[in-house]
Amino acid sequence: MPQRDALEVDVLFVGGGPASLAGAIRLQQLAKAASTELAVMVIEKGGEIGNHGFSGAVVDPKALHELFPGEEIAGGLDTPVTSDAMWFLTNGGKIKAPFVPPVLNNHGKYVASLSNLTKWLAAKAEEAGVDVFPAFPGQELLWDASTGSAQARVVGVRIGDKGVARDGSHKSNYEPGPDLTAKVVVLGEGPRGTLTKTAIARLGLDAGRDPQVYAVGIKELWKVPGRLAAGSVIHTLGAPLWNTFGGGWIYAMSDDVIDIGLVTGLDYADPTTDPHDNFQRYKLHPAIRPLLEGGEMIRYGAKAIPEGGLHAMPRFYADGLCIVGDSAGFLNGLRLKGIHLAMKSGMMAAEAIFDALQAEDTSSAKLAAYEQKFQDSWARTELHAARNFHQGFGSGIWGGLINAQLSLMTGGRGFGIKDKLAGEYGHERMKKLSELTPTQVTKRVVPDGKLTFDKVSDVFKSGTMHDESQPAHLHVSDTNICAERCTVEYGNPCQYFCPAAVYEPHFTKTGSAPAEGKLQINFANCVHCKTCDIMDPYQIITWVPPQGGEGPVYTGM
């Protein structure tokens, strides 16, 4: 076994997103007010803070104002919203809504880059005395199981090794990752976090909760002078997503940069659904194309989004553990916002943790104060009002829109009647090829390299880099299932749902004879969206962090 360095801190935040950074800052604010000192650390798998920061984003500054009362926050935000519009896209045109629903009114909000916001928050965290370490991927949780596995306590995180060859051997530059121990570990890894997934499964934190369901957001930044005024916000429904949950956005980050994207729900029925292709068709729509034509696409990215709502949130505390942000499902699908909720979750966790440290008791019973703070907060009020939003779309786009309207009128009740609509795992809604009708098969876009692009070209614009001599960080537990069953039953949907051309199935299956061929995994293309871990119908794909500092570089995203 390699000799590992060890470092002990009071509180360790995993993930350099808005939830972790806000939580770390709040913790140091409380320590300063109490004239005490805390060792607080934030680790991030990206090469720099902000490299993996990806969102729409229109930011509600509510949590920022709470975190920095009376301070200037413009450094973390870019452009005030100047106008709002809602378009319903038909196949050949658009219908502009006569008004924007109050829940989507963005007056006082900001069009912003999450990458830039997290860089600004990281600088504020370091000013407050937080140690921020990028290129430190949390590879596995450290446990103290001395009281029995059912009550195992999280005591730290092991950082991923560097210099491991593809066959698992150690290269000349091998460097074992250190063990970081802490009185409390806070998981803010984003959606479908690797350590969060492990903790939820081992500790049963999702017991009695609805399944979490996700969508994938795909977006590009375009340099297009003079098409939209800075601060313009447009949201769209309808084409091309007639049979799938989702919608689009167009945000003017400045007078010459447009942020455009499309969300596709990861609970679709057709296994040949391709979210990246959906986005290409979106850009070809007659209402969208004129906004981009003649411009230059300058950045690309993709990320999963937790859409399950209040009833799908796991218990977000345990012995020595808190879960924050997207990892805990703090996102309002109805408002299309989550950054302010992520920050608030980190701040509430920090307040509960500080009290626990002062009492020298970081047990689950003490950290349950985080749950109570949430129950008493505006975050819970907001999420309660949107608790049935995504579930309503299980009956189609029109059912979803009717449910959304009735929910708004009845405090969030499903279709105005039910307090709680049932949820289900997205991958379980996928149908087999034999259940599809020919009319459901969609013709793919042939990319022109100007307005529409293939996946590999888009990946280049994400800045993604991985050392190809390391082991693949996408683990398929049984490729025989891919060859013998998935080829026939689902047509290997990994080749479609991945927005980065990571998976290339090369299988031939004839009758009862064993399948021939292999699954090629182009892990160097991976943009860390987690779609494969979420949507694989057999749940045999596990995403784990690659070597520290690798992955996309979401500058300005």
Where are these regions (language model features)?
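Conserved Rossmann-like nucleotide-cofactor binding loop
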Residues: A19, E48, R192
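Predominantly flavin-linked oxidoreductase catalytic cores and closely associated redox partners
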Residues: T36, W120, K124-P290, M348
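N-terminal FAD cofactor-binding segment of flavoenzymes
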Residues: E37, K45-G92
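FAD-binding beta-loop-beta segment adjacent to the flavin cofactor pocket
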Residues: K303-G333, D458-S469, C482-F497, E504
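Active-site-proximal substrate-binding core of FAD-dependent oxidoreductases
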Residues: G329-R335, M347, E351-I397, A515, ...
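C-terminal auxiliary extensions adjacent to catalytic cores
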Residues: F393-K450
